[in-house]
A protein has these predicted regions:
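ATP-dependent carboxylate activation and anion-phosphoryl transfer catalytic cores
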Residues: 3-175
């Protein structure tokens, strides 16, 4: 339990020892293309905006990655997503749990686009406008090694802010 300054309580159930990961995808209502899967470095329960993350995942097995892909595709289709979707997961003992799904562009899409040298926002925009379907694009992500997303904190400019990381985002940006 985390007491918020506005006197509301945020109850957040979590899985002890879970690894957090997230997937971003483009969906045209029928077909889904996973643009990237990132593994968080901080423990599950730290806000995704405050967590370092690795693209592609460094410690997730093929079974887990396939479950993430399957869940992402099913959720995107079930929500009738046309455009981008971000789905966050908790993984414990190779079992994948869904934390949340956001049918919108997430803060990780520009990071993935830059890492893979693919204009995913342009593709998604064309899909949303009905100009193209997912199958119309020739996706060819290129990368070598790993890309790391790192949060930027401005605690020195806001000295009275609680610095303890948790389910509410504290960072002011990412690099």
């Amino acid at each position: 339990m985390y007491k918020r300054q506005d006197n509301n309580l945020l109850l957040d159930h979590y899985l002890d020892g879970a690894i957090e990961a997230e997937a971003d995808a483009i969906c045209d209502g029928e077909d889904v293309y996973i643009i990237g899967i990132m593994e968080h470095i901080e423990p599950c329960g730290i806000h995704s905006g405050d967590s370092n993350a690795c693209l592609p995942p460094f410690n997730l097995g093929d079974l887990v990655i396939q479950q993430i892909k399957d869940h992402t595709k099913k959720i995107a289709k079930a929500l009738n997503t046309v455009g981008l979707i971000n789905v966050q997961f908790a993984i414990v003992n190779d079992k994948v749990y869904i934390i949340e799904a956001n049918p919108r562009a997430s803060r990780t899409v520009p990071f993935i686009s830059k890492a893979y040298k693919e204009p995913y926002v342009n593709y998604a925009t064309k899909v949303m406008l009905g100009v193209n379907k997912v199958k119309d694009f020739d996706f060819k992500p290129t990368y070598k090694g790993y890309a790391i997303k790192e949060p930027v904190f401005s605690f020195s400019k806001f000295p009275n802010v609680n610095k303890k990381l948790g389910p509410e985002m504290k960072s002011t940006g990412e690099s």
